Amino acid sequence: MASTTSRSARPARRNNKAAGSTTPLLWLAFALLVVLLDQFFKIVIVRSFTYGESRPVTGFFNLVLVYNKGAAFSFLADAGGWQRWFFTGLGVVVGAFIVWLLYRHTGQRLFCFAVSLILGGAVGNVVDRVIYGHVIDFLDFYVGRYHWPAFNVADCAITVGAVLLIVDELRRVRKH
């Protein structure tokens, strides 16, 4: 007796990815793009400016070349040198955690976009710490005589990514 089982009767393979999900490699490529943009602008500034030089662009914005041995707002900048490796190690650990998150949350596009920005920014600043021993900052916004601490493209990416994480979480909470 011939077998009555045909190929069409076999269950179809299921795709484990959620509808609308993307590959983590896409988000890693995006993070790499952030790193490349950050490093490109830092190289341009380092080649075009002397340390401490400031060039006005508008009435509230200068390009400037400054170094930051600490973290945001020069936190721990005068700590004696150990902070270079502390912040480098922290950036590597955060980067590894974000890569893990990207593989765990492929169906959450806004979340993946946000953490990719944070990853790119973290890696951009880690590159500076490893190569130069400090982070290169060059964006200087001010009002009158008050200057916001100088920052860079990597810092912008981290900030935008953090804001988008908050937006993503608020959207998720609102759905439930």
Swiss-Prot record:
Keyword Magnesium included in the entry's annotation: no
Record membrane topology: Multi-pass membrane protein
Catalytic activity as recorded in UniProt: Release of signal peptides from bacterial membrane prolipoproteins. Hydrolyzes -Xaa-Yaa-Zaa-|-(S,diacylglyceryl)Cys-, in which Xaa is hydrophobic (preferably Leu), and Yaa (Ala or Ser) and Zaa (Gly or Ala) have small, neutral side chains
Pathway this chain belongs to: Protein modification; lipoprotein biosynthesis (signal peptide cleavage)
Short name of any one Pfam family annotated for the protein: Peptidase_A8
Family per record: Belongs to the peptidase A8 family.
Function: This protein specifically catalyzes the removal of signal peptides from prolipoproteins.
Protein name: Lipoprotein signal peptidase
Organism: Cupriavidus taiwanensis (strain DSM 17343 / BCRC 17206 / CCUG 44338 / CIP 107171 / LMG 19424 / R1)
Phylogenetic lineage: Bacteria, Pseudomonadati, Pseudomonadota, Betaproteobacteria, Burkholderiales
